[in-house]
Regions:
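Conserved catalytic alpha/beta core of Sir2/sirtuin-type deacylases, generalized to analogous enzyme cores
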Residues: 1-189
Length: 189
């Protein structure tokens, strides 16, 4: 069906409007896996590191006076920041960068986000809270057999869970047309 539409976003919008949650969640899973694999292949664009190092203060924080809007699904900003602070831990990077998106809020202690990801990110989060789950578990940018196998295993496991409607977490990808999901739209175990 996606081949008949002009863009993947149009196809996603049609699935969303028709309440085809299973197909919609599978599309988001496929996009998440694609972008994760693409990042493993192409690595971090050096422009992100250059941009961040030009705005970070001496504590490697984005100043409160700077707000960033991003419509990218990928985690290039997060990966570049992780490289700067020498951290592969996605949880600490998200909190330190003060990232907010429709479905992936900054930690409760952070009330003044610096980065607003308008289309979300290639993450999964648990339906009942703020626990973030990264498809590839870290910010690694290396394509090796172990990481590729983990990505494929995770993709296949999530695909099975979504297909069986037994998944209790949801994609952090979002579209402008998408409202926050209601409790009955989540797929629960």
């Amino acid at each position: 069906d996606c081949q008949r539409e002009i863009t993947i976003d149009t196809h996603a919008n049609i699935l969303y409007r028709n309440g085809n949650w299973k197909e919609y969640d599978l599309l988001k899973l496929n996009l998440t896996s694609f972008f994760t694999l693409q990042q493993m292949i192409t690595k971090v664009d050096p422009r992100y590191s250059h941009f961040l190092t030009s705005i970070l203060n001496s504590n490697n924080e984005i100043p409160e006076t700077i707000k960033i809007l991003s419509w990218n699904y990928d985690t290039q900003l997060e990966m570049a920041y992780g490289k700067i602070i020498k951290s592969d831990d996605i949880y600490s990077v998200l909190d330190k960068m003060k990232i907010h998106s429709k479905f992936l809020a900054v930690s409760h202690s952070n009330t003044n986000p610096n980065i607003f990801k308008l289309n979300g990110s290639i993450f999964y989060y648990y339906a009942n809270g703020f626990r973030k789950f990264y498809l590839n578990s870290g910010l690694t940018e290396n394509l090796n057999q172990s990481n590729l196998e983990r990505l494929i295993d995770n993709h296949n496991n999530y695909f099975d869970l979504i297909s069986k409607e037994k998944m209790d977490y949801s994609s952090a990808l979002s579209y402008a047309f998408e409202e926050e999901k209601k409790e009955d739209q989540y797929i629960h175990k």
